[in-house]
Amino acid sequence: MPDIRVNGVRLYYEITGEGTPIIFIHEFAGDFTSWEPQIRFFSRRYQTVTYNARGYPPSEVPEAPSSYGQNIATDDLAGIIKALKLSPAHVVGLSMGAYTTLHLGLRYPEVARSLVVAGCGYGSEPEERTTFQWDAEELARRLESEGIEKIGKIYALGPTRVQFQRKDPRGYAEFVRNLLAHSAKGSANTMRAIQAARPSLYDLADDLKKMELPTLILSGDEDWPCLKSNIFLKKTIPTSAVAVFPNSGHAINLEEPLLFNTIVQDFITQVDCGRWPRRDPKALSTSAVFSRKQST
């Protein structure tokens, strides 16, 4: 199995296809297999890359929680892009992977062509932050004490997962099987040191305002923890656009693969053609008629 040593750990990866590179970064409950519908589609025209984050076998599973963190995850991603000579790559992330994608755009913009930030926002809303951090710590504790088979089944039935179960029972069953094969230790460390500890999106506002990379923000309309923060990202990143998937939860690339692939393909095509726009500052006016300058 192909692996590469990056940032002090061994990470498993797969490359399929040839052309302009696209790298996909998985969510907490996923792994490299979560991107199969995208690899089958995009590898016909692009070089596609998937990998398992640290803590997700067959990648290395460090024992110490201090070996995990948002900055570490971002350094891992940048390291893979550089080591595999993918720069600059289109970068597509879901949930935890979307946070890493966004942080890559802030810290390593030179290695990216564009960013797709899907299902991003959990734990960012100020009124929900304490609850999210408590839930994350409790989930980590139970993963360690009760194991992935029991807790993974509970996690897979969360309020933003049932949409996938309803739409595609076979795909959902495969998602659960893959989740239950994860490392309890790696998942607990990831939940505790990355999910619970990462900064709120709102804490990044000043840096996001300066970001110049073309950015596509995606979420399901029933992925409640992401909706408010996605509007914040749209308002804050001057080169961003947002699309919301109807009747959809969290894993939108698996729930609605055709729609996801079509929207991302159109975005990447516009970027590669130099046609992705920067927002007109007048579009931020709260008036439906006058720009801020006109109304003062």
Q: PLM features: residue spans?
A:
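N-terminal cap/lid segment of alpha/beta-hydrolase-fold proteins
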Residues: 1-10
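Conserved HGGG/HGGXW glycine-rich cap/lid loop of the alpha/beta-hydrolase fold
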Residues: 9-66
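Active-site loop/oxyanion-hole signature of alpha/beta-hydrolase fold enzymes
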Residues: 39-40, 49-92, 96, 262-265
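Flexible "cap/lid" loop of the alpha/beta hydrolase fold
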Residues: 102, 106-107, 112-146, 150
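Conserved alpha/beta-hydrolase catalytic His-Asp/Glu region
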Residues: 126-131, 145-207
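Short beta-strand/loop motif that positions the catalytic acidic residue
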Residues: 211, 217-219
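Conserved alpha/beta-hydrolase "acid-adjacent" motif
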Residues: 224-229
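Catalytic active-site module of serine/aspartate enzymes centered on a nucleophile-bearing elbow/loop
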Residues: 240-296
